[in-house]
Swiss-Prot record:
This is E3 ubiquitin-protein ligase MYLIP. The lineage of its organism: Eukaryota, Metazoa, Chordata, Craniata, Vertebrata. The gene is MYLIP. Its EC number is 2.3.2.27. It is a peripheral membrane protein. E3 ubiquitin-protein ligase that mediates ubiquitination and subsequent proteasomal degradation of myosin regulatory light chain (MRLC), LDLR, VLDLR and LRP8. Activity depends on E2 enzymes of the UBE2D family. Proteasomal degradation of MRLC leads to inhibit neurite outgrowth in presence of NGF by counteracting the stabilization of MRLC by saposin-like protein (CNPY2/MSAP) and reducing CNPY2-stimulated neurite outgrowth. Acts as a sterol-dependent inhibitor of cellular cholesterol uptake by mediating ubiquitination and subsequent degradation of LDLR. It comes from Homo sapiens (Human).
Length: 445
């Protein structure tokens, strides 16, 4: 089955997947080709029959979510925005930048005149490099998506001159830094109507839910702690909110389609889980519906059967867990080379550090196979003995009374609950383990 995936820079990627593939299979293949490990920040969007933008549920089959027949057209988009310093890969940062650039040009991110000038100069630096007097005025106007006055153009040019010597990657990072401080950063907007039929925009973001007029002028802002419950019924989404008086009020939002309503319901639940929770609860992970065939099969065969099961949410990790997972993945990707450089074993050791032993991936000789097996065992041993929070220091502390031993002393001192079982930590006990450093005479990487 063929899928056409459009990147934020309008480059089209052809992705071939199995006919029964889930959305996750397609996204993983796209990110693998782009060299991106931080997959959890991204999603695949498509356009519904009524023009609504919808997120593909990565845990369900692609063919069951899309209209028509393959090839299916999808868009690679950033689903969860985080602070730029939390992004570990330059490839990930570049896709974030492309998405932000698109949002700026579309007017979805409101900024001050000073910010607009600075961002325009940085965008010029990313596209043209250092200032050149031959750069035409229309090139700057194209970047800003509007006609510029002489004063504004001169301000942008002056800022652009100051950026001489700034690399493209550095300029992109500065753009992300400026935009991440804006009020609407990371907010996903949904077009709705209220109970009286008035057009509104609902913004679902890291801190809460924004209600605006269709020109983005704010009406109300609802923080997550006062949201009791979000539910969906057909084309309607209901939000139960606690007022300052302590009473509850139910807000009704009418959507253009049932799928659009499902999209808003998903956005509220998944965004809250990603930014505000320590881990994704099983209540969110395991919520699903069944089609008629699956419902009958669950009644007469086995209620745990997967036939016809469609998951409501596809979020797997919170922002903290994504960062931790990415650090571990990057650490593991480079650990073999680092181990070989640091190892000073004698020449007869199967762990000897030699250029030939590290560059013979196609060799099937017994000694090379033994080397790779031992290196993999060493990698797993080193990872198992590292703090699960910082991934840098060795484990040397036990949480009491639960007894889990998974953190270093500095991280354990900052935790109020055990990261494994979530039970309350009464005190932390220092322990002395036979660590890999002392056993193998290696330096912790």
């Amino acid at each position: 089955m063929l899928c056409y995936v459009t990147r934020p820079d309008a480059v089209l990627m052809e992705v071939e997947v199995e006919a029964k593939a889930n959305g996750e299979d397609c996204l993983n293949q796209v990110c693998r080709r782009l060299g991106i490990i931080e997959v959890d920040y991204f999603g695949l969007q498509f356009t519904g029959s009524k023009g609504e933008s919808l997120w593909l549920n990565l845990r369900n089959r692609i063919s069951q979510q899309m209209d028509g027949l393959a090839p299916y057209r999808l868009k690679l988009r950033v689903k969860f925005f985080v602070e730029p310093h939390l992004i570990l890969q330059e490839q990930t940062r570049h896709i974030f930048f492309l998405h932000i650039k698109e949002a700026l040009l579309a007017g979805h991110l409101l900024c001050s005149p000073e910010q607009a000038v600075e961002l325009s100069a940085l965008l010029a630096q990313t596209k043209f490099g250092d200032y050149n007097q031959n750069t035409a005025k229309y090139n700057y106007e194209e970047l800003c998506a509007k006609e510029l006055s002489s004063a504004t153009l001169n301000s942008i040019v002056a800022k652009h001159k100051e950026l001489e010597g700034t690399s493209q990657a550095s300029a992109e990072y500065q753009v992300l830094q400026i935009v991440s401080a804006m009020e609407n950063y990371g907010i996903e907007w949904h077009s709705v109507r209220d109970s009286e039929g008035q057009k509104l925009l609902i913004g679902v973001g890291p801190e809460g839910i924004s209600i605006c007029k269709d020109d983005f002028s704010p009406i109300n802002r609802i923080a997550y702690p006062v949201v009791q419950m979000a539910t969906q019924s057909g084309k309607n989404v209901y939000l139960t909110v606690t007022k300052e008086s302590g009473n509850s009020i139910v807000l009704l939002f009418k959507m253009i389609s049932t799928r659009a309503a499902s999209g808003l319901y998903r956005a509220i639940t998944e965004t809250h889980a990603f930014y505000r929770c320590d881990t994704v609860t099983s209540a969110v992970m395991m919520q699903y519906s069944r089609d008629l065939k699956g419902h009958l099969a669950s009644l007469f065969l086995n209620e745990n059967i997967n036939l016809g099961k469609k998951y409501v949410f596809d979020i797997k990790r919170t922002s903290k867990e994504v960062y931790d997972h990415a650090r571990r993945a990057l650490y593991n990707a480079g650990v073999v080379d680092l181990v070989s450089r640091n190892n000073q074993s004698p020449s007869h050791s199967p762990l000897k550090s030699s250029e030939s032993s590290m560059n013979c991936s196609s060799c099937e000789g017994l000694s090379c196979q033994q080397t790779r097996v031992l290196q993999e065992k060493l990698r797993k041993l080193k990872e198992a003995m590292l703090c699960m929070v910082c991934c840098e220091e060795e484990i040397n502390s036990t949480f009491c009374p639960c007894g889990h031993t998974v953190c270093c002393e500095s991280c354990a001192a900052q935790l109020q609950s055990c990261p494994v079982c979530r039970s309350r930590v009464e005190h932390v006990q220092h322990v002395y383990l036979p660590t890999h450093t002392s056993l193998l005479n290696l330096t912790v990487i």
